[in-house]
């Protein structure tokens, strides 16, 4: 007997996932993700083919792009940050500074060249390119770009 939870998940996947994919800047084939318990800024995500993003992903880029090549797998609780808070506006607290006040250096694209495996609880920060074939270990914080085929 199929559980009610499984039936609800299948219905959700058939109805809502295609809608979320259409909101992306680009979305390839065989892309799997869990929007119910994740945070994405869809219009700034450019996703290739054969990509799997596990639950509780946090991929945020308000003025930059997150570009994910083909054959990339993200473990659970991965955080991708395409920018920083703007902290140099005099006379305003950080929570009162909107995206319209950001400087170009506050946000930079994050790029995954393809064939990557990003471990659970890892964080990738603005301006980073993860080279083709790289593996990022669980819990890693990556703030600099990597050459191809290394393990972090």
Set out the residue ranges of the language-model regions.
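A generic alpha-helix propensity feature with a strong bias for hydrophobic helices
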Residues: 21, 96, 150-151
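Flexible, glycine/small-residue-enriched loop-and-beta-strand segment within the central core
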Residues: 37-46, 52-128
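Hydrophobic transmembrane signal anchors and adjacent membrane-proximal interface regions, especially
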Residues: 2-6, 74, 113-116, 136
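Short, highly charged low-complexity linear segments
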Residues: 2-3, 12-13, 91, 110, ...
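Generic structural signal for beta-strand residues in well-ordered domains
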Residues: 24, 40, 103, 143-144
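C-terminal/domain-terminus segments
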Residues: 124-152
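Short acidic capping loops at alpha-helix termini that bridge into adjacent secondary structure
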Residues: 29, 49, 70, 114, ...
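Extended, small-residue-rich solenoid/repeat segments and analogous flexible loops
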Residues: 1-41
């Amino acid at each position: 007997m199929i559980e009610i939870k499984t039936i609800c998940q299948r219905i959700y996947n058939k109805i809502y996932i295609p809608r979320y994919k259409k909101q992306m800047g680009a979305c390839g084939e065989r892309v799997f993700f869990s929007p119910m318990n994740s945070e994405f800024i869809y219009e700034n995500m450019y996703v290739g083919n054969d990509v799997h993003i596990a639950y509780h992903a946090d991929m945020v880029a308000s003025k930059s792009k997150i570009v994910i090549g083909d054959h990339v797998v993200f473990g659970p609780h991965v955080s991708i940050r395409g920018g920083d808070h703007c902290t140099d506006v005099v006379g305003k607290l950080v929570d009162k500074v909107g995206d319209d006040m950001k400087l170009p250096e506050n946000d930079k694209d994050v790029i995954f060249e393809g064939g990557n495996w990003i471990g659970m609880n890892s964080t990738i920060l603005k301006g980073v390119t993860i080279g083709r074939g790289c593996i990022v270990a669980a819990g890693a914080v990556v703030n600099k770009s990597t050459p191809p085929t290394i393990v972090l």
